[in-house]
Amino acid sequence: MAAPVSEPTVARQKLLALLGQVQTYVFQIELLRRCDPHIGRGKLPQLKLNALQVRALRRRLRPGLEAQAGAFLTPLSVTLELLLEYAWREGERLLGSLETFATAGDVAAFFTETMGLARPCPYHQRVRLDTYGGTVHMELCFLHDVENFLKQLNYCHLITPSRGATAALERVREFMVGAVGSGLIVPPELSDPSHPCAVCFEELCVTANQGATIARRLADRICNHVTQQAQVRLDANELRRYLPHAAGLSDADRARALSVLDHALARTAGGDGQPHPSPENDSVRKEADALLEAHDVFQATTPGLYAISELRFWLASGDRAGQTTMDAFASNLTALARRELQQETAAVAVELALFGRRAEHFDRAFGSHLAALDMVDALIIGGQATSPDDQIEALIRACYDHHLTTPLLRRLVSPEQCDEEALRRVLARMGAGGAADAPKGGAGPDDDGDRVAVEEGARGLGAPGGGGEDEDRRRGPGGQGPETWGDIATQAAADVRERRRLYADRLTKRSLASLGRCVREQRGELEKMLRVSVHGEVLPATFAAVANGFAARARFCALTAGAGTVIDNRSAPGVFDAHRFMRASLLRHQVDPALLPSITHRFFELVNGPLFDHSTHSFAQPPNTALYYSVENVGLLPHLKEELARFIMGAGGSGADWAVSEFQRFYCFDGISGITPTQRAAWRYIRELIIATTLFASVYRCGELELRRPDCSRPTSEGRYRYPPGVYLTYDSDCPLVAIVESAPDGCIGPRSVVVYDRDVFSILYSVLQHLAPRLPDGGHDGPP
């Protein structure tokens, strides 16, 4: 018998199924916003039914989602809430636009309203964060702006009250409703993959760095976590394949549509897409062929005619198809445009055959605006018949094509062009009468101009078989070298040509290697920019972690306020004497140097924010690792990182320098402005708390007094929270210290719990001592005088 499934697992499965249904509805909304409104009018009954279901679902789930937001968020609950809000908002707007179109009949006005063309950009959200050190204003424009702000808020959680953080997170949530709640597909204007996320940083920390700094590696990083690439494969014959199985059509209509589709595809079928010779080169070859055809063995051979024949030999004998690089790297953007036109023509033909009208979709209604876009915008928008990978390959081929248009590379990559140019020069000289005479009985050319043209065209730049025979012929008998000054000059010229050819060949290889390396480096960015992107789980998970940390503070204060016994030292009489007594007794002692590493880790644990919780994982890492991720992800300056790392070691618990707070002014930031000074003051307060509790446990021998955070407790399956006894730092300036000295056996706060509120480290330690005194071996120390 199978084991029963737990209740949380069942709830999670139901939420996942619900999330899939809402995503499907959002996808339908996005399609109908861009579809011909006449088609949308035909779907009004189904659309209204879906809108009513979303209303009912939102009304039923909203109280539970709000309660969970105050308890413990999960990425699943965050995503579902965002989708529900977006589906409700945009579904109602689409219904209103369709009803307006039913009366007005204006297609352009419908798309202007549904696509928000007349409204300002919705992806600009101002965020205000109130901290103890002042107010911070930011603007969210990209998805990575949200992630960066959440990381910054996580780092500044020490100096941010829960109320201020909750208000700022609400503004972030409003931005995420339009950005993340709009379904799976990420709008291109929202994604900026050049900014690495926290997951990118963590991946680089566990991979080999090859001697490069983390900052340099991050600069070359293309983020694929906030948004993830989706492989899109387009079938060119999709319409032809699925049209025979379309429902709701008669056999006659289906047959007529198939016939029209086949006819349209046959009419729009283009060429083979292979490169063809230019008309100019073709005319030169025809002229040369005509001269050669008019000659026979009974006629005398002129030097020019012999040069033409030799050049035609090189043009005909060379295997150009296997050597040309242009075939592999030629631009194919025209072929993509032709494919788009073929797809559009086929779709329109089928629409006319089936419905008797051409549908006015968004891209057709605003076709003139789309046609006015430049090439970059058109590539980002994409097409219906070309996948992003096709566009990327076309762009890369265009890069090679542009690179190979330089004269040197063009002649090296396409040697036949040298022969074409030489042939054109010989024909021009023959036409001008420069080589019309000097009959020759079948020997090679002796005209210097024609010979040089032939050598440069066919041999000078590395044509097949060029150079070896001539060099042997120029050498004397027995290969003893040149015998005349003319032979020396000829050999020197041949050496120059050979060195030029070798240099050009090396230059070409280097140039193409550099271009290939550049293309490989930039291909990732091209793929991220042009491919279809879907939302990853980074943003919902980051938002949930940060929001849970601040919600835990408010929940902890609310739960402790309902304890059976609450002692509030913030306004109690006689607390000053307790403060003075405990302060004097602790300042007489020093922290054992052997304890400095452990209390340093305790300091890192309290300073670290709620986002990076590596110390709580199954394979836990020390607290300094989580703090390292926290400070590096916000770009903390090196001198501040050094100061933070040595904060505990600098004090060491010696003297009275570590006791920085005045009576009832612990975690007070009055008179301090600025994020960094306030953050440094918070570090001092936390150091004071750690050293004081360490000395307290050492002096009074009461065992280790636990310092805890309010977000250390996770809800149980019953929704209850367990807070073990200890001193809790709430990071709230009104009530920064809460001591739980007694609690129920299960660890939950209830009628048997005893809680102490305080704003002073030493007075709260004295209250803890009073409750521990009956259990101490010596009955405790005397109280204050």
Curated annotation (Swiss-Prot):
A zinc finger (C3H1-type) spans 197-225. Disulfide bonds: none annotated. Its main location: host cell. Keywords: ATP-binding, Host nucleus, Late protein, Metal-binding, Nucleotide-binding, Viral genome packaging, Viral release from host cell, Zinc, Zinc-finger. The keyword Repeat does not apply. It is found in: Host nucleus. GO terms for molecular function: ATP binding; zinc ion binding. GO terms for biological process: viral DNA genome packaging. It holds the Pfam family PRTP. InterPro entries: UL28/UL56. GO terms for cellular component: host cell nucleus. Residues 433-452, 457-489 are annotated as: Disordered. It comes from the Viruses. ATP binds at residues 696-703. The keyword Acetylation does not apply. Belongs to the herpesviridae TRM1 protein family. Associates with TRM2 and TRM3 to form the tripartite terminase complex. Interacts with portal protein. Component of the molecular motor that translocates viral genomic DNA in empty capsid during DNA packaging. Forms a tripartite terminase complex together with TRM2 and TRM3 in the host cytoplasm. Once the complex reaches the host nucleus, it interacts with the capsid portal vertex. This portal forms a ring in which genomic DNA is translocated into the capsid. TRM1 carries an endonuclease activity that plays an important role for the cleavage of concatemeric viral DNA into unit length genomes. This is Tripartite terminase subunit 1. It comes from Human herpesvirus 1 (strain 17) (HHV-1).
